[in-house]
Every structure is written in structure tokens, then in C-alpha cells.
């Protein structure tokens, strides 16, 4: 629950702060950028998130940082959906940083945040289910090599030694 609170507070702080909010790329009228941008922003957001998350996650696995940031999440060696957002507060701050990146790099509508967060929660819960929804052999397909599946993530939790 603390993680979700941090995920809500940090973007709101940047948006609502009188000295910071006016400098964000947040917009309120879809007509300002049009429907093409509204829908086209999502692939960009997911690509930005994947890049950000990959490097942040690798950094948190560094031996000098792991115990401070990421150990709490890895205490779940056979993760369940409840582990999806079981983070140390410092890790939660790092994870929510992508929302701050969005706020200062691309035009972003409040619905972008809502839809992106909803889809992220769904995929993160799936990633911690411990059972697979993709077909057998998917990990050998070219696309499967680029997608972190639930089983792959479960093995990451089970076999990683910090």
C-alpha cells in the first residue's frame, strides 16, 4: 500500500506544485494535441518505460545497491500478485520516476497517466502470478525473447542470489 501511495503522491507533487507544475508537459484538452497523439503516445510511453525500468532494475541489482533498494521485492522467491508492488520505499521512488520523466519530456494528458498506470498494474500482477498465459514455446519465438513473461520473472525471483 505504501508503494501505491508513493506512486500517487510523486506525480501529483510535480503536477500541483506551484513552482514546478506550470513547467510540465501536462495538458488537459485532448484537442490541444489531437487524438492521433493521444493514442500514439502510448507506444512511446511503453518504450520509454521499458528502457527506464530495464536500467533502473539493473542498477538496483548492483551488489552495493541491492540490499538498500531491491531486497524487499526479492524476499518473495515464489512471487504472487501481492509481490507486484511489494517494494522498499526507495525502490518505489525510483520506479515512479518514469512518471516524472513523462511529465518533462512528452505532452501528457491525465488519461495517459490513468491508462498507463492501469495497464502497468495489470501486467505487473501478471508478471508475478507464477503461471503463464503465453503459449508453450513462446519464449523461443522472436517476440518472446523481448517480453518478460511470468515464468521468466518467477525464475528471476527464485534463482537470483543478491
PLM feature segments, named:
Residues 1-71, 75-103:
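Non-catalytic, topology-defining segments of multipass membrane proteins
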Residues 63-162:
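Cytosolic/stromal cytosol-facing helical appendages immediately following the last transmembrane segment
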